[in-house]
From Swiss-Prot:
PROSITE patterns: TRP_SYNTHASE_ALPHA (PS00167). InterPro entries: Aldolase_TIM, RibuloseP-bd_barrel, Trp_synthase_alpha_AS, Trp_synthase_suA. SUPFAM superfamilies: Ribulose-phoshate binding barrel. It comes from the Bacteria. Pathway: Amino-acid biosynthesis; L-tryptophan biosynthesis; L-tryptophan from chorismate: step 5/5. The keyword tRNA processing does not apply. This is Tryptophan synthase alpha chain. Disulfide bonds: none annotated. The lineage of its organism: Bacteria, Pseudomonadati, Pseudomonadota, Betaproteobacteria, Burkholderiales. It comes from Cupriavidus metallidurans (strain ATCC 43123 / DSM 2839 / NBRC 102507 / CH34) (Ralstonia metallidurans).
Length: 265
C-alpha cells in the first residue's frame, strides 16, 4: 500500500474527508517552503500538493502564475523542490507529498532520472497537468515502478472515454476539477459536482478529491459532503501572497485549521 492509499484508507475508516492543500514550492520565499509544508500538516492536511514552478503554467490562473514567477525569479528548480521534500521527510514520514506541475521540467531532467530522484526524496505521487492519460501508460508505469502514484485530472467536460482512460492509468486518487477554466476562477456548482462523482466512480475505484473554486470553510464543507477529499490551492497561494512574510507560516496553519474544523464538523 502506498502512503497515499494508506492515508485514504485511514480517512475512510474514521469516516473523515481528506484535506489536500496546494502551495507553490519556493513561494513566497524559498527559505519558507519546508516550514509551510509542516504548517499545512499542523493545521490538519492529509496530503500536500507541492507545485513545481514553471514559466508557462497554462492551466493556472493569475494567482498561481504569479507564484510560479516569484519562485522562478528566486532560482527555484525541480532539483531544489526535491531537496525540500527530502528535508521535509527528515521529520515527517507519514504525510503524502504529491508534486503537481508540467511536463517540461520533468522531461528536461529525464523521466527515468526524475522518477528515481523523486522516489528517493520521498515523493508519493506525481500529477503532470499536460500529460494526456491516453498517451501516458509508460510514464504511469514508471511512476508505479518507483513507488509513486500517477495522479490525473478530470473535468466536467471529461467524456466517458476520457474517464475510462484515466481509470486505466491512475492510482492514489483522482483530482476532479469542479469548474472549467483556470485555477482560482468562477464559482462552484455543487449540484453538478454531486451528479458527476458517481459517474466517475463507476469507472474508477479510487478516492476523488475535488478542487477549483474552494475558497473558505463553507465551500470546503459543501464539497466535503459529496467528495472523498477537498483540494484547495489558489486561495492558499493568495493568502501567502498577501500575508506579511514573517506571518506566512502562522497564517497558513490557521487557515488550514479552519478548513479542517469545517470538514470534521
Amino acid at each position: 500500500m502506498s502512503r497515499i492509499q494508506k492515508t485514504f484508507a485511514a480517512l475512510a475508516a474514521q469516516q473523515k474527508k481528506g484535506l489536500i492543500p496546494f502551495i507553490t514550492a519556493g513561494d513566497p520565499a524559498p527559505a519558507l517552503t519546508v516550514d509551510l509544508m509542516h504548517a499545512l500538516v499542523a493545521g490538519g492536511a492529509d496530503v500536500i500538493e507541492l507545485g513545481v514552478p514553471f514559466s508557462d503554467p497554462m492551466a493556472d490562473g493569475p494567482v498561481i502564475q504569479r507564484a510560479s514567477e516569484r519562485a522562478l525569479a528566486q532560482g527555484v528548480s525541480l532539483t531544489q523542490v526535491l531537496a525540500w521534500v527530502t528535508e521535509f521527510r527528515k521529520t515527517n514520514a507519514t504525510t503524502p507529498v504529491v508534486l503537481m506541475g508540467y511536463a517540461n521540467p520533468i522531461e528536461r531532467m529525464g523521466e527515468e532520472t526524475f522518477a528515481k530522484a523523486a522516489s528517493a526524496a520521498g515523493v508519493d505521487g506525481v500529477l503532470v497537468v499536460d500529460y494526456p492519460p491516453e498517451e501516458c501508460e509508460s510514464f504511469a508505469a514508471l511512476m508505479r515502478a518507483n513507488q509513486m502514484d500517477p495522479i490525473f485530472l478530470l473535468a466536467p467536460t471529461s467524456t466517458d472515454d476520457r474517464i475510462a482512460a484515466v481509470a486505466k492509468v491512475a492510482s492514489g486518487y483522482l483530482y476532479y476539477v469542479s469548474l472549467t477554466g483556470v485555477t482560482g476562477s468562477a464559482t462552484l456548482d455543487l449540484e453538478s459536482v454531486a451528479a458527476r462523482l458517481p459517474l466517475i466512480k463507476q469507472h474508477a475505484n479510487l478516492p476523488v478529491g475535488v478542487g477549483f473554486g474552494i475558497r473558505d470553510a463553507q465551500t470546503a464543507r459543501a464539497i466535503g459532503s459529496v467528495a472523498d477529499a477537498v483540494v484547495i490551492g489558489s486561495r492558499l497561494v493568495q493568502l501567502l501572497e498577501d500575508a506579511p512574510r514573517e506571518k506566512a507560516v502562522d497564517s497558513l496553519r490557521a487557515f488550514i485549521a479552519d478548513i479542517r474544523q469545517a470538514l470534521d464538523a
